[in-house]
Amino acid sequence: MQLSATSGRTSFRVSQDLRTGPANFLSGLRDDDSLLRQVFFSILRHHHPNLAAKVDVIYALSQAWCTSQSDNDFELMVKYVSDLKPEERILVASSFSHMLNLHNLTEEVNSSQIGRAVRLGEMDSPTRDTNHSLLKLTTTNGFTPQQVYDTLCSQTVELVLTAHPTQALRASLLKKYAIVRRELDTLHSKRMSEYEKIETLEAIRAAVQAAWRTDEIRRSKPTPQDEMRSGLSYFSTVIFDVVPVFHRRVDTALEKLGLPRLPLDRALFKFGSWMGGDRDGNPNVTAETTRDVVVLARLEAVNVYFRQVEGLMFDLSIWRCSPEMKELAERLAAAESRDAARVAEERKRRNYVDFWAPIPPTEPFRVVLAHMRDRLYNTRQVLHQCLIHTHMSVRGALEEAGAYVDIEDMARPLKLMYDSLMSTGDESVANARLLDLLRQIRTFGLCMMGLDVRQESTRHTEVMDAVTTYLGLGSYASWDEPKRLAFLLGELQGKRPLMPPGMDMSPEVKEVVRTLRILSELPGDSLGAYIISMAKTASDVLAVVLLQRETGVRPALRVVPLFETLDDLHNAPGTMTTLLGNDWYRGHINGVQECMIGYSDSGKDAGRLAAAWALYETQEKLVEVAAGCGVRLVLFHGRGGTVGRGGGPTHMAIRSQPSGTINGHLRVTVQGEIIEQQFGEKEVCFRTLDLYTSAVLEAALDPPPAPAQEWRDLMSLLATESCDMYRSVVYRTPEFYDYFMQSTAASELGRLNIGSRPSSRKSGGIETLRAIPWIFAWTQQRLHLPVWLGIGEALEAAIDKGYGPVLQDMYANWPFFTSTLDLVEMVLAKADSRLSAFYERTLVDSSLAPLGQRLRELLAKTQQNILIVVRKSVLLEGNTPSQMSTPNLDEKIRLRSPYVAPLNVLQALSLQGLRKFRDGGDTEYNPSDPEIIDLLSRDPHKKGEGAQHPFVSAMDDCLMITIKGIAAGMQNTG
């Protein structure tokens, strides 16, 4: 049977077998890809019939080349694309970008279908989940159910959302694509009438058409407040609702083992944020910015709790209750009855859904909930005032108004209601929406996500130097480490104030101090950790402890050193030995120390393999140092989304950590496009929570065995060899920087407006470039150099020395090594030497061509040696543990490739055109068609006096669209 949905001049069909069972998910993926491409082409033909024909030809040419890999087929595609007019290039780029994003939706739906089939028992799970972990630990590993229960109840995963500029898609498009994803999933998962199917297809068409008519390019840079609002949208639409659903699933799994539910006061997850708190290298994050985002997050929390409480007022109409509940309700009702008319009028003015009049004590739950609703409303009003009047102390204003400041003020009456319902035998009512709200309160608090503050270590040194210089004590910046430590510890153990009022300050020093003073005026639960980036010494930590005391930050934020470069990672154990060896400091931290390890800068500094091994060894040594000092260490993993910045499948990434470094508590960043990939939809969010929970549980009870000494020794040799090779190319090859800047879009990425932070810390070479644009640029150019450079030579050297069998044994039996090579293999499968060579041919000075040829030879060598170690004939052959989290990965990459290749060609041509024009080249391009002029005039910042030449506008837009499209094709940016 086939169904036809017709709109305007076109029609498209969907085969019934798209919605059959899970017998062939790969076939379903191809069918979904074909369906959405068909829908898109029907829209394109409706609006641009001539252009649609050209897009169709380019897609066919790209498919032919991706299949044959022949130079002739490639040149045919290049020739056809090169002949496009500038305005056609924009629309063709946009077409392929949209088709890639639509294809990605089919992959997400495919994953959801597989997950659903697993839960129905129709197929084995390709990844671990909490239910499987509970069964495995109790049946296979020999742990008692009580041991597993106690471990689960004590573990916490904290996911810290960051605003790193790696989400290339606009929120406007994400919302439309979410509709397509939902409706496509509906086609698969529901029994539908013929009319319902047609209507669902029309809904898909409407969303795709709206997306096509939406400008893909973000025309102005987002502010940190914009980034926070974007992050909060995931909570209000997805995460807040999924958390209690996931806890219910865990409760059910526990009950199947004869265990009780999770305790009411336990939260398996906490959420944090860097949005508006990360000021490292971002001048747009000011003290006022930090204040704003805290207020915005609290407003979001109050709004969602308000809706939940109002819903409970309809649910809990019950009259029977415990004596304690009755006493509270009568007391609140009596207070209201003294001014009943005013209460009713005020509630009516507030436009509540219902329950305006004072509620009688015979409905005790509603009495208490009405009081909570009033207080939430008041809290919201105060927070609105704080946004308007920026001079107000947020904490002071909330306390003065009697608004909610402490989450326990909300939790206590709700817990009383729960206990009351349980005592009267109304367990089912207690364990419905009320239990969900209790779980949400324990997870999100009143802050939704606690804000970390991050600042670079030298900024604190500047403040301390200003203080000591003003006091006539000398220059703190020139002191050696022992003198700094002696001074800081002396001040911390004394009681005198250090910073005199009216002290002269530079603007930079003033901003650091102003930030700390703002923190002192914010509710303590809204703040998380104070992260010190580029931390190198114990004094870096103590300086922040002292500055918090001097500025009145109470309670003080825990101070977390971030070790990022290879040298800093190697020196971290010594730094922490000095710090934790101090009696005063150990007492100050109450026996718990958090350290952050950075995956991004270490990889950029030393290469992927050397960084991975340094991170592994550093974690082991930090745990050992902390244990020796009687301190519990919490490791905060600063992972990025890409493999080059520590990204990878969640479960395998956690299970490959050194034994004893997780211990039931994981704190990890969720960056950029990964937020959408992990929390963009409820089914996906549920799976994300499931993976983290099961992985941390298994890491605590069933950690991987320690690697054999022979493996460690060989790994150290590999790390040294790969680091030397990586640095010799990146930092010691004089022409490398020029090749990088010419062959990639690195210098143009800053105009993409995907984040508030600049792409470089300061002007200079590779050293000053941030890790994100460094990875982003090579990803776009398809060489993916930061991920693999140095690894092929290191493996080859080891194989030549006879270590091939040892490497194969390491790969088969050591999760860390398995995960590392599998992720590199996955990236190698996305690399494309032919396209990279086209960038070089089009953009790079011929004198640099030998370097490009050498890099491509190194890529081929890496692919060859990886295949030897993993015992495969082609990349991604079979299902390895790391790749099992993405079933059919090789086929998915093949399906994406014909969409990506034209975008790479268009990007190289756009860069060529822009650079020639800016170097003084001339063009006769001067369109007169009003529709084309309108297309080239979408940027409001480039009109009037700021108007660009139409050719530059066309190439600029084409470039920006290709950057976004290729990011979608690679499924990551930086």
Curated annotation (Swiss-Prot):
Domain of life per record: Eukaryota
Enzyme kind, highest EC tier: lyase
Activity regulation (UniProt): Activated by glutamine and dihydroxyacetone phosphate. Inhibited by glutamate, aspartate, 2-oxoglutarate and malate.
Reaction equations catalysed: oxaloacetate + phosphate = phosphoenolpyruvate + hydrogencarbonate
Record note on pH: Optimum pH is 8.1.
Keywords: Allosteric enzyme, Carbon dioxide fixation, Cytoplasm, Lyase, Magnesium, Pyruvate
Transmembrane domains' residue ranges: none
Cofactor needs: Mg(2+)
GO BP: any one term: carbon fixation
Compartment annotation: Cytoplasm
CC terms in the record's Gene Ontology section: cytoplasm
Alphabetized PROSITE patterns for the sequence: PEPCASE_1, PEPCASE_2
The keyword Magnesium is annotated on this UniProt entry: yes
Listed EC numbers: 4.1.1.31
InterPro entries per UniProt: PEP_COase, PEP_COase_bac/pln-type, PEP_COase_Lys_AS, PEPCASE_His_AS, Pyrv/PenolPyrv_kinase-like_dom
Alphabetized GO MF terms: phosphoenolpyruvate carboxylase activity
Active site (UniProt): 164, 604
Family to which the UniProt record says this protein belongs: Belongs to the PEPCase type 1 family.
Record note on quaternary structure: Exists as a homotetramer or heterooligomer.
Matches recorded under HAMAP family: PEPcase_type1
Function as written in the Swiss-Prot or TrEMBL entry: Through the carboxylation of phosphoenolpyruvate (PEP) it forms oxaloacetate, a four-carbon dicarboxylic acid source for the tricarboxylic acid cycle.
UniProt-recorded name of the protein: Phosphoenolpyruvate carboxylase 1
Originating species: Chlamydomonas reinhardtii (Chlamydomonas smithii)
Gene: Ppc1
